[in-house]
């Protein structure tokens, strides 16, 4: 691999000269473009830390600290660009050097916190600060914690994962084109939940739970996550006293000792129609 000096209004950067970069430069010179080339050009600009192909300005220290606020991390050193190391500080006052890119995009956190045991009170405070509830004991930063998010979803995330920005997998879904309220069932219970991809979710639950005969009974397409969450909560409240009591896998609290047909009848009272029917 060779290197090539790219000039951008009086600034020159020595970067790896790959076929992708060669293609980006050539297309820029002759005025041609395509979605693929635009993405490559954007990555090239981000690599150099001077903005992107859409003309957006590079991030400021204030921008980065706002993005990192819920992780308890902030920049305290000089900021040059995303690929140049600077000094970060965590909420326990540890300082270390890292590139902004590794903190923002690779989700790396404080190396001192990940290697040291912290008190249960401090763990509880970190979790409550993001609106979550701790439902299990704390062993170490790399052992998954049983958590409940502020939307009532049960999930399993390590303390390291929380520090790196991981959150409830249900709440992190993007619902621009709508999503699904689904009903899954097997010989020992029925599960009601929400997902963008119910078939994929079925495989995940089967793998984590070991319920090999679990199957997708039916689903309902909904326009936004808020509507789906409200209906999911209605079902969970209705059958609260019939919860199966499963644990130790994501979605374990969403199983009920109820026939799936009964849940369909309950949802019909909200005027819902089964997807594809």
Curated annotation (Swiss-Prot):
Task: Identify the EC number(s).
Answer: 3.1.-.-
In terms of superkingdom, the source organism counts as Viruses
UniProt key word Metal-binding: no
Please name the GO terms that the record assigns under molecular function. DNA binding; endonuclease activity
Residue pairs linked by disulfide bridges in the UniProt entry = none
tRNA processing listed as a keyword: no
Q: Name one Pfam family in it.
A: MUG113
Enzyme class name? hydrolase
The protein's UniProt keywords, in alphabetical order, are:
DNA-binding, Endonuclease, Hydrolase, Late protein, Nuclease
Induction context: Expressed in the late phase of the viral replicative cycle.
Could you tell me what this protein does? Putative endonuclease.
Task: Report what the protein is called.
Answer: Putative endonuclease
Q: Supply the source organism for this entry.
A: Escherichia phage T5 (Enterobacteria phage T5)
């Amino acid at each position: 691999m060779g290197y090539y000096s790219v000039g951008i209004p009086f600034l020159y950067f020595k970067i790896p000269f790959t076929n992708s970069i060669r293609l980006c430069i050539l297309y820029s010179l002759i005025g041609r473009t395509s979605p693929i080339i635009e993405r490559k050009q954007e990555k090239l600009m981000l690599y150099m830390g001077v903005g992107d192909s859409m003309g957006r300005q590079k991030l400021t220290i204030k921008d980065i600290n706002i993005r990192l606020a819920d992780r308890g991390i902030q920049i305290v050193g000089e900021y040059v660009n995303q690929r140049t190391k600077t000094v970060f500080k965590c909420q326990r006052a540890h300082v270390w050097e890292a590139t902004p890119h590794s903190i923002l995009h690779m989700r790396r956190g404080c190396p001192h916190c990940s290697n040291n045991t912290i008190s249960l009170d401090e763990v509880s405070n970190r979790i409550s600060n993001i609106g979550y509830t701790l439902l299990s004991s704390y062993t170490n930063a790399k052992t998954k914690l049983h958590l409940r998010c502020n939307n009532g979803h049960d999930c399993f995330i390590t303390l390291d994962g929380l520090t790196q920005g991981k959150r409830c997998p249900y709440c992190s879904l993007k619902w621009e084109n709508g999503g699904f309220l689904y009903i899954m069932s097997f010989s020992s219970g029925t599960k009601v939940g929400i997902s963008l991809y119910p078939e994929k979710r079925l495989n995940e639950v089967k793998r984590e739970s070991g319920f090999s005969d679990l199957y997708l009974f039916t689903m309902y397409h909904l326009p936004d996550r808020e509507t789906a969450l409200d209906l999911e909560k209605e079902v969970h409240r209705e059958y609260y006293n019939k919860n199966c009591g499963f644990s130790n896998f994501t979605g374990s609290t969403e199983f009920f000792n109820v026939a799936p047909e009964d849940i369909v009848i309950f949802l019909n009272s909200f005027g819902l129609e089964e997807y594809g029917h």
